[in-house]
């Protein structure tokens, strides 16, 4: 085989223009940015695996069991899957509305020093809120796709019956795009959703004045700033913590 057959000379600018967007879209869709159901693929795979394991109303099982079963949908290593699972638990306190009822040491999102225990020591099951996330999944409400090796199906989205994407904080950094969605009080969120469905001109700030955070704290903002954030989806504010000693 000649040398010319092994190499193709192409301008680097042409390659970047051709391949950057497909690569960016692959990262955005496949792992980095939460979908409209409020979940990244890694979250969805764990929760759906637990649902199929009948952990919605059943007894807790070892976290190691869930991690192992999740590998059928997610070919990442056990440590990556377990770290993702930890954040979804009540024990870690990272979410305003935890999806996983946990038993054991899952660390704390507010502590850099308090590490979570190994998955062989901790136990998990789906929290009651997941009843509203999975209630109609067997009624042809969402599309399913084959997993990475074509041996089973998994949902593209979860049919949550409330605006879950705003119920918990969700951060994602992709290629050329990033998102950082704060969480909101669930009662206010549901009231605002109902009001908006009844009247699209509803002033959401009157019902849902600002985000709510699982770590608590005092928000520093003005109403006009929050109005701009609600309208554009872009903006920032300060969250002040309190230290008791």
Q: Which role does the model predict for each range below?
A:
Residues 1-233:
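Catalytic phosphate-handling regions of large nucleic-acid enzymes and associated NTPases
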Residues 238, 243-245:
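Protein-protein interaction/assembly regions in multi-subunit complexes
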């Amino acid at each position: 085989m000649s040398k010319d057959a092994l190499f193709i000379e192409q301008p680097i600018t042409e390659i970047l223009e051709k391949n950057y967007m497909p690569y960016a879209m692959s990262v955005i869709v496949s792992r980095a940015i939460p979908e409209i159901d409020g979940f990244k693929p890694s979250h969805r795979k764990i929760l759906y695996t637990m649902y199929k394991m009948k952990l919605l109303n059943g007894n807790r099982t070892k976290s190691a069991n869930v991690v192992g079963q999740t590998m059928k949908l997610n070919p990442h290593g056990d440590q990556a899957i377990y770290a993702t699972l930890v954040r979804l638990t009540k024990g870690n306190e990272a979410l305003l509305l935890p999806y996983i009822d946990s038993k054991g040491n899952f660390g704390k999102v507010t502590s850099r020093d308090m590490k979570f225990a190994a998955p062989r020591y901790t136990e998990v099951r789906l929290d009651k809120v997941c009843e509203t996330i999975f209630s109609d999944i067997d009624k042809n409400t969402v599309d399913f796709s084959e997993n990475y090796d074509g041996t089973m199906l998994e949902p593209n989205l979860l049919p949550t019956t409330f605006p879950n994407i705003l119920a918990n904080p969700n951060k994602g950094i992709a290629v050329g795009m990033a998102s950082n969605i704060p969480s909101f009080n669930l009662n206010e969120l549901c009231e605002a959703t109902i009001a908006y469905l009844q009247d699209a001109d509803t002033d959401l700030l009157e019902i849902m004045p600002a985000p709510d955070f699982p770590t608590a704290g005092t928000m520093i903002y003005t109403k006009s700033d929050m109005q701009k954030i609600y309208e554009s989806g872009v903006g920032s504010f300060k969250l002040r913590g309190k230290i008791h000693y």
